[in-house]
Amino acid sequence: MRNRAAIIGAGVSGLTCGVVFAERGWDATIFADETGQKTTSGAAAAVWFPYDAEPADKIIPWSLITYGRLRELACDSQSGASMLEIWQFTRVGLVPIPDWAKNLGARPISVIPSEVEGSLTIPAFPSLFSNGYALNVPLIDTTIYLDYLANRFHNAGGTIESAHINKVEEIPRDFDVIVNCAGIGARELFHDSQLEPHRGQVAIVPKLDLAQAIVCDDAPLMYAIPRTHDCVFGGTNSISENREPSAADTTAIVSECSRVLGIEAPPVIVVKVGLRPFRKSGVRLERERLSDGRTVIHNYGHGGAGFTLSWACAEEVCAIASRTS
């Protein structure tokens, strides 16, 4: 008889765990009251990048493993994954190229002619940025990828049940393991005061002729991410519980992205808001034995790196579960 796994949450972490468990022979069920574009994952720009998550000594190895998995998926035209060059800029001073980025082939960008061998000189944006670096990374079109994961999960025998889990005791006892991918919801579900919501708002605009993703983490935070059928303008990152779109934020986002790209402000198709589940003490990926004897494996607190960490964390969760059962 197959081991049974109950997974709480249908964002990218929950769906990826579901795929890994189901494809490794588990009888897996996902419990979630929000799916697809209604999840926090649906509001993500979803460019692979270790962003807004701790600790670095775990985040970077997990990110690199997931980089490899997503690069493989980019070969499947149905997955919603592709490879894209990202230009990471700074407005003041120099942006250091992290060692992990160098190992992936990152090269410096200068807005003025550079004597650095292998550097890329960008004539655009000279008055806006000082320098940056270019790197090829996986890009996830969430409008395709989340459905791809859900279909892959179903095809492997998995089930998604619509349910709002208020307490873990509501999970039927005939499951061998419970996997907690509740994101910011883990704060109430498991009384974790280390979680704080980092609010992100984006504006989806019509598709632009943009060959690269443009990102700047300096204030004001901005990014323009080209996708299959549209473009994501962002963004915000503030500690807030507010899931409602802010008209002022939308105006600021579209204005800054348009200014950087040197274009007229495009019409906004839709505005999305998500609460990044940042955990002050770092991503929680560990096994816990509940007072009733059941096993929970936590997988949450990924901050702004949910897609970036998804496959490595899911594989580690499944490995822990396999040793437990």
Predicted features by range, described:
Residues Y133-N166, P172-F175:
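Helical element adjacent to the flavin cofactor pocket in flavoenzyme catalytic cores
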Residues E34-Q37, A163, E169, D176-D217, ...:
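Central helical "cap/lid" subdomain
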Residues E72, D209-A211, T228-D230, S238-R279, ...:
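Flavin-binding catalytic cores
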Residues R4-T29:
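N-terminal Rossmann-like FAD-binding beta1-loop-alpha1 element of flavoenzymes
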Residues E23-G42:
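Glycine-rich FAD pyrophosphate-binding loop
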Residues Y148, I269-S325:
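C-terminal catalytic lobe of FAD-dependent flavoproteins
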Residues A45-F129:
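Dinucleotide-binding Rossmann-like beta1-alpha1 core, especially the glycine-rich loop
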Residues P55-I65, G132-Y148, E244-A248, T308-L309:
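Short beta-strand to alpha-helix junction loop
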